[in-house]
Amino acid sequence: MKNIVLILLVLFSFNIMAQNKEPFKIYKDSTISSYNAILTSCKDADFVFFGEDHDSPIAHWLEYELLTDLYQVKKEELIVGAEMFEADNQLILNEYLEDKIDDKKFQEEARLWPNYKTDYKPLIKFCKDSSVQFVATNIPRRYASIVSKKGFEILDSLSSEAKSYIARLPINYNDSVGCYKEMLVDMGKEHATPNIAKAQAIKDATMAYFILKNYKKGNLFLHYNGSFHSDKHDGIVRYLIAEKKKVKVVVITTVSQEDISKIEDDNKNLGDFIICVTENMTRTY
């Protein structure tokens, strides 16, 4: 009996210690918040941008939880989209969602990210099983690539079909403000390549374009993207608001910190909610 009590005391002590090793905290306005606060805010939104670290298991878990919980509230009014799927793959994505092709064929023919099976397949499967519309919002990477080499002008030479997978041209671009300015500054004067920022902008503009193209009043559009694309309500959000001003947008962003007991100054204003993950967290790939 004494041995059992001793074991229970050891296990209890270990459990208390483990509870102090928190993998993440959620912040809003520099103060501790919660997942329920995120969910409550998102329920009334028109657009929700979940900015992820692409290899963060915490971000991907919360992405799935938010999807399933918002579906319980919005049902057929919920639309989902993601940076990880390119616009010219919309047909094959629809064919898979509508059971016209199987999972094996979809994975063979769609250009999927390396972490699709672990991180994005659960989202796709839920939308498939629940008949939720899923929009491939990103520009085909080959077009972003040529912009990074030759600038926006090269897009004018594309066919009408190719242009149908891109935001309407010309896009409004200013590299002296916002995230594109920051990108060029981070590169440094010696290594700054203006066309790299332009490639980022054409991605953001295209994602905003396809989000708005599929959105109808009363919908809630939940979009998954790398955090850089929506941090500080910039990037995709800037292009979206330029076209549709009187809407409620919620931005969630993911950051990593060594110490998550308080939010670092550089991370405070990145989003409406900040998911602050410990740097020791394992990665999905």
Model-derived features: positions:
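N- or domain-start disorder-to-order transition segments that initiate the globular core
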Residues: 4, 17-45
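Sec-dependent N-terminal signal peptides
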Residues: 4-14
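Alpha-helical scaffolding within the catalytic cores
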Residues: 25-38, 165, 170, 205-210, ...
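N-terminal, post-signal-peptide region of Sec/Tat-exported proteins
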Residues: 43-78, 84
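Solvent-exposed loop/turn segments at secondary-structure junctions
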Residues: 53-57, 85-89, 140-144, 227-230, ...
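A substrate-binding/cap region within the structured catalytic cores of diverse enzymes
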Residues: 78, 91-214
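Short internal beta-strands
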Residues: 78-85, 250-255
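C-terminal regions of proteins
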Residues: 206-215, 219-222, 229-285
